[in-house]
């Protein structure tokens, strides 16, 4: 990244600027499975310019992420304080709020959250959470067995709120190319390692689902292009499903447990290596997905499930020697359960992952950039900013015969690009129409057009061509 951008980062981002050098800091986190948004928070906490207070950071990690056999320490009666990722499950049958820590092998049936802790923290609901917990071993009510009890909890939320206007003002000082490089560097990649602007735009398109509610995306790419990393490391508001079994109950609502599923409390849910995931009761799941992808709600028994969570399907696709898909029918790479036009037509956006480079060590960024934990909070906050969708309506005209799904898809994708690349556009007068067309509208039409074409291959009843959608003249 060039020195001009770095100077702007230091000048305009202020406290949200962070110096990254994983070659010297990764060993500080060795043996601790931490996502980037946690690492950036800790590095910022102990940063002194380009240097890190290594002793202070190590001491903090030893305190809240102790090593050793923690289960044995619990059995010996020790209290343990831990910064960790844990899951919460409300057991209505036994009237108990349970938690588990997958990284430590503590199962949900072994952990309990008492009412005095739960009542102070409404976020302790079904799902996965990052936070600092204090726990100890306590006897069950009957005295015959014991359980791990959470006696205190502090959510991992360094930013209780973020001011979007700050980022909007910062963005005014960067060109579009510079802002794009800043986003990529905050994701820990060296912008100069991407060969073209097209590659960079393809890469950051993965972030659209972070900023736009109920955006449904498909990405097919070769292995090694960093799909898992983006969705597992940048934001605590997403959920990554990697392998295993998926049911309607797990995604939407479990009637037996009266418990909401993954989609309820997350900004997005990404299926990684979708070819390896087993979808049980596929007919039930497919029916719920069709309804949810279309309307943001699904009926499970007598329960209506609603959410703003977006869905991401990620899979591998075979390529030729010149890195083009072997088969023009891209969706043949998906599992049978997802290879139905009526379901796929409800997805908005397609990412052509074969244009992305294979990730290697030379692509890891070193230098000043934006703190990714801060940027993830900005993206989360942008989801509820309606000004960009209103701008789209003012800027765009379209063929009145356009289908609702096609137009909705283009609007959501273009709106997401505005939030990500042009957050400072808050009135029509702010908008550069040429850039809007180039970076927002045309990519949106193209990405929805791929969905359209692929559905046509499956079922010729679906039109292959996109309707006319264009920028209004001023």
Where do the PLM segments sit?
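Conserved NTP phosphate-binding and transfer environment spanning the P-loop NTPase/kinase superfamily
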Residues: 63, 343-344, 348-474
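Short acidic (Asp/Glu) and glycine-rich catalytic loops that position anionic groups and cofactors
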Residues: 158-162, 266-271, 318-326, 350-359, ...
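Conserved ASCE/P-loop NTPase catalytic core
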Residues: 190-323, 327-329, 345, 467-470
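C-terminal, active-site-flanking charged/polar segments
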Residues: 312, 333-348
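Conserved P-loop NTPase catalytic core
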Residues: 318-337, 359-369
């Amino acid at each position: 990244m060039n020195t001009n951008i770095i100077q702007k980062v230091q000048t305009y981002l202020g406290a949200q600027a962070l110096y990254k050098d994983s070659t010297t800091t990764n060993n500080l986190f060795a043996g601790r499975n931490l996502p980037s948004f946690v690492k950036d928070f800790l590095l910022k906490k102990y940063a002194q310019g380009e240097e890190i207070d290594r002793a202070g950071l190590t001491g903090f990690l030893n305190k809240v992420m102790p090593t050793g056999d923690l289960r044995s320490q619990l059995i010996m009666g020790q209290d343990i304080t831990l910064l960790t990722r844990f899951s919460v499950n409300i057991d209505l049958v036994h009237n108990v709020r349970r938690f588990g820590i997958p990284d430590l092998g503590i199962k949900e049936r072994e952990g309990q959250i008492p009412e005095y802790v739960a009542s102070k923290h409404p976020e302790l609901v079904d799902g996965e959470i990052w936070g600092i917990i204090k726990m100890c071993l306590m006897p069950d009510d009957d005295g015959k067995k014991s359980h791990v009890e959470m006696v205190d909890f502090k959510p991992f939320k360094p930013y209780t709120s973020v001011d979007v206007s700050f980022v909007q003002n910062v963005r005014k000082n960067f060109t579009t190319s510079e802002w794009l490089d800043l986003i990529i560097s905050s994701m820990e990649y060296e912008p100069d390692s991407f060969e073209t602007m097209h590659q960079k735009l393809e890469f950051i398109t993965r972030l659209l689902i972070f900023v736009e509610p109920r955006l449904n995306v498909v990405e097919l790419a070769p292995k090694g292009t960093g799909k898992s990393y983006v969705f597992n490391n940048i934001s605590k508001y997403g959920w990554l499903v990697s392998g295993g079994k998926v049911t309607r109950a797990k995604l939407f609502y479990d009637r037996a447990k009266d418990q909401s599923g993954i989609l309820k409390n997350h900004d997005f849910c990404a299926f990684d290596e979708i070819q390896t995931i087993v979808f049980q009761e596929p007919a039930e799941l497919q029916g719920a997905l069709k309804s949810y992808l279309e309307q943001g709600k699904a009926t499970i028994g007598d329960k209506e499930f609603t959410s703003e969570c977006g869905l991401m399907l990620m899979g591998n696709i075979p390529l030729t020697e010149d890195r083009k898909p072997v088969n023009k029918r891209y969706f043949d790479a998906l599992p049978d359960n997802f290879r139905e036009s009526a379901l796929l037509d409800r997805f908005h956006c397609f990412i052509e992952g074969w244009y992305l480079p294979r990730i290697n060590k030379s692509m890891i960024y070193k230098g000043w950039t934006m703190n990714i934990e801060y940027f993830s909070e900005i993206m989360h906050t942008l989801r509820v900013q309606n000004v960009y969708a209103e701008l789209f309506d003012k800027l765009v005209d379209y063929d009145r015969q356009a289908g609702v799904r096609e137009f909705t898809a283009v609007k959501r994708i273009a709106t997401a690009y505005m939030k990500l690349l042009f957050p400072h556009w808050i009135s029509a007068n702010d908008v550069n129409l040429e850039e809007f067309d180039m970076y927002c509208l045309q990519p949106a039409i193209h990405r929805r057009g791929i969905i359209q074409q692929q559905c046509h291959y499956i079922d010729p009843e679906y039109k292959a061509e996109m309707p006319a959608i264009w920028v209004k003249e001023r």
